[in-house]
């Protein structure tokens, strides 16, 4: 979990993890732990959650990430799904989920990997669209093929209930205003760096047909 206001994060083990089914179940469990149904969607304490299921990286086509938050559209719990590299980047960062709380003091980019968390001031990107932002973040965070870059445009910056989160240029968390939630946290971008390795369990290898 990352606290943007404090500028620090930690790796935590979630009690009850095994009773949650898939990325959607994990995201809901994390919102129960970190979120509040009483507070408004743009309260800094409300979490922005990115979660994957147990088969990601182990079984073909399990490549979606679940983004969960309290929606600016109807002020209720919501989730949106996206493809791209985000799910595998989380897996290779040795994370089942990323939980972001708080509000950064300046427009910022959050970078996370298997051994690091970094929050960088990117005020100069505020106002840029997702394409210009993506080009700049790719230069700032090399490692094509191993990292996933999530970012918002001007609609997200103003908290629009229709703003999505762009993922690796061609994919989107497109439903229910996740981009507005990022903007409310002063978060212009998130870079997930899949910089670790994991091995398949020997007794779980799936033979080719």
Residue ranges and their predicted role:
Residues 1-81, 85-209:
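Intrinsically disordered, low-complexity segments enriched in small residues
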């Amino acid at each position: 979990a990352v606290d943007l206001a404090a500028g620090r994060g930690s790796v935590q083990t979630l009690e009850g993890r095994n009773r949650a089914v898939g990325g959607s179940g994990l995201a809901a469990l994390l919102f129960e732990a970190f979120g509040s149904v009483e507070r408004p969607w743009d309260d800094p304490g409300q979490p922005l959650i990115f979660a994957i299921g147990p088969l990601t990286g182990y079984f073909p086509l399990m490549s979606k990430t679940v983004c969960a938050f309290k929606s600016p559209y109807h002020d209720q719990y919501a989730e949106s799904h996206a493809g791209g590299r985000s799910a595998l980047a989380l897996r290779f960062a040795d994370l089942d989920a990323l939980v972001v709380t708080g509000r950064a003091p300046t427009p910022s980019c959050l970078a996370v990997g298997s051994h690091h968390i970094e929050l960088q001031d990117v005020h100069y990107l505020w106002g840029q669209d997702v394409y210009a932002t993506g080009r700049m973040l790719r230069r700032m965070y090399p490692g094509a093929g191993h990292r996933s870059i999530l970012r918002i445009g001007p609609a997200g910056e103003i908290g629009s209930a229709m703003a999505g989160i762009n993922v690796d240029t061609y994919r989107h968390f497109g439903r229910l205003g996740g981009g507005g939630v990022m903007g409310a946290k002063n978060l212009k971008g998130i870079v997930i760096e899949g910089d670790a390795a994991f091995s398949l369990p020997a007794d779980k290898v799936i033979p080719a047909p």
